[in-house]
Each structure stands twice: as C-alpha cells, then as structure tokens.
C-alpha cells in the first residue's frame, strides 16, 4: 500500500500488546468462502480477526491503558521488553466499536463508528491465519464501492505474515493470530505498536495529526495489493521484498512512508501499479463508467506463471450485470498492455521517470515466490494522513509530472479530518470470495487462464457477454440433468438446468448457477 494503513485517526481503543487479555469477550465475525478445484467448490466457514493495533491494551494486573492518545504509559512501558511483559491485548466489540460485520458470505467494514477505519485478516482456525498459495491461481470476489468516496481506500490484499502471528518465532508474543499480531507489508510500517514480540517504544515519536506515531523499528514483508480502490479510482500493485517473510527493520533503512529515504534496503514501497486512469483511460472505472462503481461488481485476478515456474503476469478483469469486462489497455506512449508483466513495469517506470525499485527488489519473479510460499488475506478501510490518498485518486505528486494523473479527485481532497467529518457512514462490502486454479472461475473461459475475450488482444476497453464453462469432471449418476458441481444455469447457458437428488441448482451469479 502506498502509505501505511495506520497513518490515520484512531479515535478509540487504540494500542498494541503481546499478552492475551480476558476483560473483553473475543467474538470474531464469521465469513464463508470457497476454495475451488475441478471437483467443485467446498464451502469453508471461517472468521475474520481485527488487527492488534486497533485493540485495547491494558496492564495485565488490571485495566490501566498501556497506550493513551499517542503516547506510551511510562511506568508500564519504560522499554520494549518490559512493555510486552506488562501489557495484555484484549478482545473487541467488532460491530459497535470497529464497524466490522460478518454475515454469511459477506464482510462489511464501516469507516467511522466509535473508531476510525479497520483492518482484519482471514482465519483458518482460532489460532492460525488462513494461508493462500496463489501462484498460478486466480481469486475472485464481489465488491460494493458505492459508499467509498474520494480520499478513502477499501482494500483487499495479501501480506506474507506468519501463520501464527509470530508466536513460534518470538516467545514474548503470547497473543498471536488469535489477537491478530504480526502485521507487515512492503511499506515496512513503523507505526506498529508491537513488532517481533516487543513494544516499539524506543524512539517513539507521537504523530502531530492522529493517535499514532512512529518508532525506531518497522515490520517488512512482501505485499500483493489485489484491490485498492474507492468509487473514483482503483489500482492493483505487486510489492516484492528481497526477504519474503516478515522481518524487522530499523530507522531509515526501512524505507516506505515513514523514512527519509523511501527506497529502503528490503522492500519496494512503490510497487508496479496498474491504475487505468494513470495509464490514460479516464472513462474505464467510476460512477457511470465502463466498470460502474454505483453498483456491485466482481473482481477476478489471475497470477500466471511461465514454463520456468516463475510469476510472469498478473491479470485483472471484471464482471458486472452479466458481462465480462476486460481491463483497460494502456494509452501511455511507450507502454503497452492491460496486465502487469516485467516488460510493462520496466516501460512504465521509464515513461513516468519513476525509480525502478521494483526490478531492484526482484520484480515479478520475487513476487511469485511470495505467492507460492503463501500469504494472508487482508481487508481494510482507511484514510491517509501521509498523502491524503492523492496517490490513488487525484494528481500526485504536485506539481504535475508524467504519471501524476491518477484519478479525478481534486488535489485538495482526502484531508482526513474532512473525510472523517463528511463521510462517516462510508463502508465497503466484500463478498463471495473464492479462489482456485487458473480457469476455475465461471468467468475466465476455462483452463486458459484468461477471460473469454483475451484482455491482451484488445486495443481498447470492451465488454462481452460472459461464456461460463463447467469445470466439473463429475459424472451424473442418474444420467439426466447436470452433474454434481456442474453448471446448471445462467445467462446464455443452454445446458441441463436440473440436478440429480439430493442436489439443487444454486445461483452463484447472473451468468452462473451450479449443482450443489
């Protein structure tokens, strides 16, 4: 992410801790999702967990806060190790305090409740994050961006966090994934209250415009931004790191948002982004545009490897109102294509005069290693105290330079105090999350790993009627109707529409129903 997610106001219950508290009940919101294979898409009923930095932390002996405003409590936290021993991280009122609501297949994140913003992770069980291995796979989900204005970011992305939140590696971390510890990303955020089982007390400098601050240390790891967006602009961006998994950095060597040298030793903070507006198509994404953000749509992202097994291409396309919409083509001189490849990234950096830290940190090949190794799924809603989200939806930097036009938002937009006051009811809803091998989604045209009309072959943004294909190899025991897991309906479908007992034809989208 361009700026660390925690660079914004946290109005209540903010701090970190590494002991496990018991004063507030721990009830994670539920989320149903699917992992698909050629044999079908079994349903997984799991939960989401709120990041540790948002939680109330208090003395293990009582309810005295370890962190108030944007300062550590001096008696409890004279140094990092003492603070970790003295402070407990507690449960959360997900809906009332943090605006996180899970309902079946959907998770909604509201921007302002008693708190401002939120970040949550998909769980495998009560003590482990769900780890997704997405190299040569595709992931798709529905999203409603209609209530996310300019200046906000409703994001879904991957982080190479430890599955247990760092408990095994760092014995002083007693809270672990159950309390959502161990966050990291390619910005190497230094505003995290706890890193590697100790408090980030040393060198802590309180922020001048929010309830955070920065310490001497940051937490780095590879990051894949699948979806960063509001109803004005969107971008998808790989961020490789030379060391894939979570690791701690120190001072300006961290790079990223909070360091004097943005281009640190470990991670590519800028990444290689595909933002349709930035790439010259100003009519592709937004309210009333080709991808119309006034209503819900599906995002499909494919991570395609080459014959050597390395990540070679990241493709994205969309589905709305029964149509597959290919990603827009670049209209920038010297940059071609509508997907992220190594050549696209090199050409883009040259055309815009950007520092090519992406290639220096290993490029797509290094990003592919992280995807193969498995990453944690993250969902968030946030505003940006570092750059007012201009890097996503406005002109950035100012004055104008090549590649600075990123969205139609005014350069005066995104000021957190104004966004908080004027758009408190903003929310993003992610739903119907699924992943599996290339071609498994009903929108991607079978095993080829591309949508029915190849995005790379189109000279301009187009849309076409979807051609869903059955991925089932199951047989139909009764000899009539569709087989178990096979397609049984959808726009343009002419096959059997009944299912053998005890299965029923369940609608997944307007263009696809399946015997389940």
From Swiss-Prot:
Q: Where is this region: Catalytic?
A: 18-445
Catalytic residue positions: 223, 228
| Amino acid composition bias (Low complexity), ranges on this chain | 449-481
Q: What is its EC number?
A: 3.2.1.91
Q: Which UniProt keywords apply?
A: Carbohydrate metabolism, Cellulose degradation, Disulfide bond, Glycoprotein, Glycosidase, Hydrolase, Polysaccharide degradation, Secreted, Signal
The yes or no answer to whether the keyword Translocase is present is: no
Q: Name one GO molecular function term.
A: cellulose binding
Give residue ranges for domain CBM1: 480-516
Q: Where in the cell?
A: Secreted
Q: What range does the record give for the signal peptide?
A: 1-17
The segments labelled Disordered in the record are 444-481
Question: What is the protein's major site of localization?
Answer: secreted
One record GO biological process: cellulose catabolic process
Keyword Glycoprotein in annotation: yes
| Chain positions covered by the region annotation Linker | 446-480
- Provide the glycosylation site positions: 45, 281
Q: Which reaction does it catalyse?
A: Hydrolysis of (1->4)-beta-D-glucosidic linkages in cellulose and cellotetraose, releasing cellobiose from the non-reducing ends of the chains
A Pfam match is: CBM_1
Q: Which cysteines are joined by disulfide bonds?
A: 488-505, 499-515
GO CC entries: extracellular region
The protein's matches in InterPro entries, at most eight in alphabetical order, are given as:
CBD_sf (IPR035971), Cellulose-bd_dom_fun (IPR000254), ConA-like_dom_sf (IPR013320), Glyco_hydro_7 (IPR001722), Glyco_hydro_7_sf (IPR037019)
Family, per entry? Belongs to the glycosyl hydrolase 7 (cellulase C) family.
The name this protein goes by in its record: Exoglucanase 1
| Origin species | Neurospora crassa (strain ATCC 24698 / 74-OR23-1A / CBS 708.71 / DSM 1257 / FGSC 987)
The lineage, from the top, is: Eukaryota, Fungi, Dikarya, Ascomycota, Pezizomycotina
**Gene for this protein?**
cbh-1
């Amino acid at each position: 992410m361009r700026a660390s997610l925690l660079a914004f106001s946290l109005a209540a219950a903010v701090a970190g801790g590494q002991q496990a508290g018991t004063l507030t009940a721990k009830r994670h919101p539920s989320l149903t999702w699917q992992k698909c294979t050629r044999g079908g898409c079994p349903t997984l009923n799991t939960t989401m967990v709120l990041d540790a930095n948002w939680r109330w932390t208090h003395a293990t002996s009582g309810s005295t806060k370890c962190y108030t405003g944007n300062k550590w409590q001096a008696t409890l936290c004279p140094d990092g190790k003492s603070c970790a021993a003295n402070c407990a991280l507690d449960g959360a009122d997900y809906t009332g305090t943090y605006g996180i609501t899970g309902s079946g297949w959907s998770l909604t994140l509201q921007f302002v409740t008693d708190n401002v913003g939120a970040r949550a992770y998909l769980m495998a069980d009560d003590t482990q994050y769900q780890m997704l291995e997405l190299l040569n796979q595709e992931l798709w989900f529905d999203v409603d961006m209609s209530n996310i204005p300019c200046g906000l970011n409703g994001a879904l992305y991957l982080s190479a966090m430890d599955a247990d939140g760092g408990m095994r590696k760092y014995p002083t971390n007693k809270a672990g994934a159950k309390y959502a510890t161990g966050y990291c990303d390619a910005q190497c955020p230094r505003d995290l209250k706890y890193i590697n089982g100790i408090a980030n007390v040393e060198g802590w400098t309180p922020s001048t415009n929010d309830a955070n601050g920065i310490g001497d240390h940051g937490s780095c790891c590879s990051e894949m931004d699948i979806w960063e967006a509001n109803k004005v602009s969107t971008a998808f961006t790989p961020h490789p790191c030379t060391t894939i998994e979570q690791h701690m950095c120190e001072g300006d060597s961290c790079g990223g948002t909070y360091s004097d040298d943005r281009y640190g030793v470990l991670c590519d903070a800028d990444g290689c982004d595909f933002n349709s507006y930035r790439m010259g198509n100003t009519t592709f994404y937004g309210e009333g545009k080709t991808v119309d953000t006034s209503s819900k749509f599906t995002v499909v992202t494919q991570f395609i490897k080459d014959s050597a097994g390395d990540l070679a291409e990241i493709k994205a396309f969309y589905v709305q109102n029964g149509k597959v919409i290919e990603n827009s083509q670049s209209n920038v001189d010297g940059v071609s294509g509508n997907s992220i490849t190594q050549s696209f990234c090199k050409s883009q950096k040259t055309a815009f005069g950007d520092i090519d830290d992406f290639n220096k940190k290993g490029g797509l090949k290094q990003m592919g290693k992280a995807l193969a190794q498995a990453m944690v799924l993250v969902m968030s809603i946030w505003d940006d105290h570092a750059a007012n989200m201009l890097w996503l939806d406005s002109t950035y930097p100012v004055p104008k330079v090549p590649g600075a036009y990123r969205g139609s938002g005014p350069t005066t937009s995104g000021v957190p105090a104004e966004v908080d006051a004027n758009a408190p009811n903003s929310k993003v809803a992610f739903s119907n999350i699924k992943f599996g091998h290339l071609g498994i989604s009903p929108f991607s045209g079978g095993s080829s790993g591309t949508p029915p009309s190849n995005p790379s072959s189109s000279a301009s943004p187009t849309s076409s009627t979807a051609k869903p294909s059955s991925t089932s190899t199951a047989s139909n025991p009764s000899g009539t109707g569709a087989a178990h897991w096979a397609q049984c309906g959808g726009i343009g479908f002419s096959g059997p529409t009944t299912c053998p007992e005890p299965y029923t034809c369940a609608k997944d989208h307007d263009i696809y129903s399946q015997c389940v």
